[in-house]
Amino acid sequence: MLSKDEKERLRGLSKEHAENVGLHMLAAYSIEEEEPELALEHAKWIARQASRIDLARETLAFIAYRQGDYKLALKEFRTAYRMNGYLDYLPFMADCERGLGNPRKAIEVASSEESKQLQGDAKAEMFLVYAGALGDLGLWDKAIETVHTLSLAKGLSGGYRMRAVQAEQNFLEQNGRSEDALALEPLLDKLEAQYADEDDEESSQDVAVDYDLEKLSDSKLEQIGIEAEDGGFRRRS
Protein backbone atom coordinates (compact mmCIF):
# COMPACT_ATOMS: atom_id res chain seq x y z
CA MET A 1 0.00 0.00 0.00
CA LEU A 2 1.29 3.45 -0.90
CA SER A 3 2.10 5.83 1.91
CA LYS A 4 0.19 9.06 2.43
CA ASP A 5 3.15 11.02 1.09
CA GLU A 6 3.38 8.86 -2.04
CA LYS A 7 -0.33 9.29 -2.72
CA GLU A 8 0.06 13.03 -2.29
CA ARG A 9 2.88 13.08 -4.84
CA LEU A 10 0.61 11.40 -7.39
CA ARG A 11 -2.12 14.02 -7.06
CA GLY A 12 -1.12 15.57 -10.38
CA LEU A 13 -2.69 12.55 -12.09
CA SER A 14 -6.35 11.69 -12.47
CA LYS A 15 -7.67 9.39 -9.76
CA GLU A 16 -7.85 6.37 -12.07
CA HIS A 17 -4.42 7.00 -13.55
CA ALA A 18 -2.90 7.52 -10.12
CA GLU A 19 -4.35 4.19 -8.98
CA ASN A 20 -2.86 2.41 -12.00
CA VAL A 21 0.53 4.01 -11.46
CA GLY A 22 0.36 3.11 -7.77
CA LEU A 23 -0.41 -0.53 -8.56
CA HIS A 24 2.54 -0.76 -10.94
CA MET A 25 4.73 0.88 -8.31
CA LEU A 26 3.71 -1.67 -5.68
CA ALA A 27 4.26 -4.47 -8.17
CA ALA A 28 7.72 -3.19 -9.05
CA TYR A 29 8.87 -3.07 -5.45
CA SER A 30 7.23 -6.36 -4.43
CA ILE A 31 8.93 -8.44 -7.16
CA GLU A 32 12.20 -6.52 -7.32
CA GLU A 33 14.32 -9.21 -5.66
CA GLU A 34 12.78 -12.26 -7.32
CA GLU A 35 12.08 -10.83 -10.79
CA PRO A 36 14.32 -7.77 -11.23
CA GLU A 37 13.85 -7.48 -14.99
CA LEU A 38 10.07 -7.46 -14.69
CA ALA A 39 10.29 -4.97 -11.82
CA LEU A 40 12.36 -2.69 -14.04
CA GLU A 41 9.74 -2.95 -16.78
CA HIS A 42 7.05 -1.90 -14.32
CA ALA A 43 9.21 1.06 -13.26
CA LYS A 44 9.81 2.08 -16.88
CA TRP A 45 6.07 1.94 -17.53
CA ILE A 46 5.49 4.19 -14.52
CA ALA A 47 8.06 6.71 -15.75
CA ARG A 48 6.51 6.76 -19.24
CA GLN A 49 2.93 7.05 -18.04
CA ALA A 50 3.66 9.68 -15.38
CA SER A 51 6.74 11.36 -16.83
CA ARG A 52 6.04 14.69 -15.13
CA ILE A 53 5.59 13.18 -11.67
CA ASP A 54 8.75 13.18 -9.58
CA LEU A 55 7.81 10.01 -7.69
CA ALA A 56 7.53 8.11 -10.97
CA ARG A 57 11.03 9.13 -12.05
CA GLU A 58 12.35 8.46 -8.55
CA THR A 59 10.92 4.94 -8.58
CA LEU A 60 12.65 4.10 -11.85
CA ALA A 61 15.88 5.68 -10.60
CA PHE A 62 16.06 3.56 -7.46
CA ILE A 63 15.11 0.29 -9.13
CA ALA A 64 17.61 0.87 -11.94
CA TYR A 65 20.25 1.83 -9.38
CA ARG A 66 19.77 -1.33 -7.34
CA GLN A 67 20.05 -3.39 -10.52
CA GLY A 68 23.30 -1.74 -11.52
CA ASP A 69 21.90 0.16 -14.51
CA TYR A 70 23.76 3.29 -13.47
CA LYS A 71 23.30 5.16 -16.74
CA LEU A 72 19.51 4.94 -16.54
CA ALA A 73 19.50 5.53 -12.80
CA LEU A 74 21.61 8.67 -13.10
CA LYS A 75 19.36 10.04 -15.84
CA GLU A 76 16.25 9.48 -13.73
CA PHE A 77 17.78 10.81 -10.51
CA ARG A 78 18.79 13.97 -12.35
CA THR A 79 15.29 14.36 -13.77
CA ALA A 80 13.65 13.85 -10.38
CA TYR A 81 16.13 16.26 -8.80
CA ARG A 82 15.26 18.96 -11.32
CA MET A 83 11.61 18.45 -10.44
CA ASN A 84 11.80 18.54 -6.65
CA GLY A 85 15.32 19.50 -5.58
CA TYR A 86 15.44 16.56 -3.17
CA LEU A 87 19.01 16.65 -1.85
CA ASP A 88 19.02 13.06 -0.65
CA TYR A 89 19.32 11.91 -4.28
CA LEU A 90 22.84 13.36 -4.43
CA PRO A 91 24.72 10.43 -2.84
CA PHE A 92 23.06 8.05 -5.29
CA MET A 93 23.88 10.32 -8.21
CA ALA A 94 27.51 10.38 -7.09
CA ASP A 95 27.55 6.60 -6.72
CA CYS A 96 26.10 6.24 -10.22
CA GLU A 97 29.07 8.22 -11.51
CA ARG A 98 31.34 5.75 -9.72
CA GLY A 99 29.43 2.87 -11.27
CA LEU A 100 29.95 4.43 -14.70
CA GLY A 101 33.70 4.63 -14.09
CA ASN A 102 33.76 8.36 -13.35
CA PRO A 103 35.17 8.70 -9.81
CA ARG A 104 36.27 12.29 -10.41
CA LYS A 105 32.71 13.25 -11.32
CA ALA A 106 31.53 11.48 -8.18
CA ILE A 107 33.92 13.61 -6.15
CA GLU A 108 32.61 16.73 -7.89
CA VAL A 109 29.07 15.85 -6.84
CA ALA A 110 30.21 15.08 -3.29
CA SER A 111 32.08 18.38 -3.09
CA SER A 112 29.29 20.51 -4.53
CA GLU A 113 27.60 23.31 -2.62
CA GLU A 114 24.36 21.32 -2.70
CA SER A 115 26.01 18.32 -1.04
CA LYS A 116 27.24 20.50 1.80
CA GLN A 117 23.59 20.91 2.81
CA LEU A 118 23.09 17.17 3.37
CA GLN A 119 22.32 16.01 6.88
CA GLY A 120 22.12 12.80 8.86
CA ASP A 121 22.11 9.51 6.98
CA ALA A 122 22.26 11.19 3.56
CA LYS A 123 25.42 13.00 4.64
CA ALA A 124 26.93 9.75 5.91
CA GLU A 125 26.01 8.02 2.64
CA MET A 126 27.76 10.74 0.69
CA PHE A 127 30.93 10.38 2.75
CA LEU A 128 30.97 6.65 1.99
CA VAL A 129 30.54 7.32 -1.72
CA TYR A 130 33.21 10.02 -1.61
CA ALA A 131 35.62 7.68 0.13
CA GLY A 132 34.88 4.97 -2.41
CA ALA A 133 35.66 7.39 -5.25
CA LEU A 134 38.97 8.25 -3.59
CA GLY A 135 39.70 4.54 -3.46
CA ASP A 136 38.80 4.19 -7.14
CA LEU A 137 41.56 6.71 -7.83
CA GLY A 138 44.02 4.82 -5.64
CA LEU A 139 44.02 7.55 -2.98
CA TRP A 140 43.81 5.00 -0.21
CA ASP A 141 45.19 7.12 2.62
CA LYS A 142 42.55 9.80 2.03
CA ALA A 143 39.83 7.18 1.67
CA ILE A 144 40.87 5.51 4.93
CA GLU A 145 41.00 8.83 6.76
CA THR A 146 37.53 9.76 5.53
CA VAL A 147 35.77 6.60 6.66
CA HIS A 148 37.77 6.36 9.88
CA THR A 149 36.77 9.89 10.84
CA LEU A 150 33.17 9.19 9.84
CA SER A 151 33.08 6.09 12.04
CA LEU A 152 33.93 8.22 15.07
CA ALA A 153 31.00 10.61 14.77
CA LYS A 154 28.89 10.30 17.93
CA GLY A 155 25.67 11.19 16.11
CA LEU A 156 26.13 8.47 13.49
CA SER A 157 23.54 5.68 13.36
CA GLY A 158 24.76 2.17 14.11
CA GLY A 159 24.17 0.93 10.58
CA TYR A 160 26.34 3.64 9.09
CA ARG A 161 28.96 3.17 11.78
CA MET A 162 29.16 -0.48 10.74
CA ARG A 163 29.43 0.42 7.07
CA ALA A 164 32.15 2.98 7.77
CA VAL A 165 34.25 0.38 9.61
CA GLN A 166 33.59 -2.18 6.86
CA ALA A 167 34.80 0.34 4.30
CA GLU A 168 37.87 1.16 6.39
CA GLN A 169 38.79 -2.50 6.64
CA ASN A 170 38.34 -2.96 2.89
CA PHE A 171 40.44 0.11 2.07
CA LEU A 172 43.19 -1.03 4.44
CA GLU A 173 43.31 -4.41 2.69
CA GLN A 174 43.35 -2.75 -0.72
CA ASN A 175 46.25 -0.60 0.48
CA GLY A 176 48.25 -3.63 1.58
CA ARG A 177 47.74 -3.01 5.30
CA SER A 178 46.43 -6.46 6.15
CA GLU A 179 47.43 -6.37 9.82
CA ASP A 180 45.62 -3.08 10.38
CA ALA A 181 42.58 -4.48 8.59
CA LEU A 182 42.64 -7.61 10.75
CA ALA A 183 42.82 -5.48 13.90
CA LEU A 184 39.34 -4.12 13.07
CA GLU A 185 37.75 -7.59 13.20
CA PRO A 186 36.63 -7.51 16.87
CA LEU A 187 35.00 -4.12 16.44
CA LEU A 188 33.40 -5.11 13.15
CA ASP A 189 32.09 -8.38 14.60
CA LYS A 190 30.42 -6.41 17.38
CA LEU A 191 28.86 -3.91 15.01
CA GLU A 192 27.67 -6.53 12.53
CA ALA A 193 26.10 -8.56 15.34
CA GLN A 194 24.11 -5.48 16.33
CA TYR A 195 23.26 -3.89 13.02
CA ALA A 196 23.77 -6.19 10.03
CA ASP A 197 20.17 -7.42 9.91
CA GLU A 198 18.38 -4.43 11.38
CA ASP A 199 16.23 -1.91 9.58
CA ASP A 200 17.55 1.63 9.43
CA GLU A 201 15.44 2.77 12.38
CA GLU A 202 18.18 3.65 14.82
CA SER A 203 18.61 6.42 17.33
CA SER A 204 20.68 9.40 16.28
CA GLN A 205 22.28 9.11 19.72
CA ASP A 206 23.68 5.64 19.02
CA VAL A 207 26.82 5.01 21.04
CA ALA A 208 27.63 1.39 20.20
CA VAL A 209 31.23 2.45 19.70
CA ASP A 210 32.40 5.20 22.00
CA TYR A 211 35.32 7.15 20.53
CA ASP A 212 36.51 10.60 21.50
CA LEU A 213 36.50 13.00 18.56
CA GLU A 214 38.45 15.54 20.58
CA LYS A 215 41.56 13.53 19.75
CA LEU A 216 41.19 14.53 16.10
CA SER A 217 42.41 17.88 14.81
CA ASP A 218 39.86 20.57 13.98
CA SER A 219 41.32 20.88 10.49
CA LYS A 220 40.74 17.19 9.80
CA LEU A 221 37.18 17.41 11.07
CA GLU A 222 36.58 20.52 8.97
CA GLN A 223 37.84 18.73 5.87
CA ILE A 224 35.51 15.79 6.42
CA GLY A 225 32.59 18.01 7.45
CA ILE A 226 32.08 16.91 11.04
CA GLU A 227 31.42 19.41 13.79
CA ALA A 228 34.39 19.52 16.13
CA GLU A 229 32.36 20.52 19.18
CA ASP A 230 29.96 17.61 19.34
CA GLY A 231 31.01 15.08 16.74
CA GLY A 232 27.67 15.34 14.99
CA PHE A 233 26.82 16.18 11.42
CA ARG A 234 26.30 19.80 10.57
CA ARG A 235 24.79 21.82 7.80
CA ARG A 236 27.28 24.04 6.03
CA SER A 237 25.93 26.89 3.93
Identify the meaning behind each predicted range.
Residues 10-16, 44-51, 78-85, 112-120, ...:
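Solenoid-like repeat scaffolds
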Residues 23, 56, 89-90, 126, ...:
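TPR alpha-solenoid repeat register
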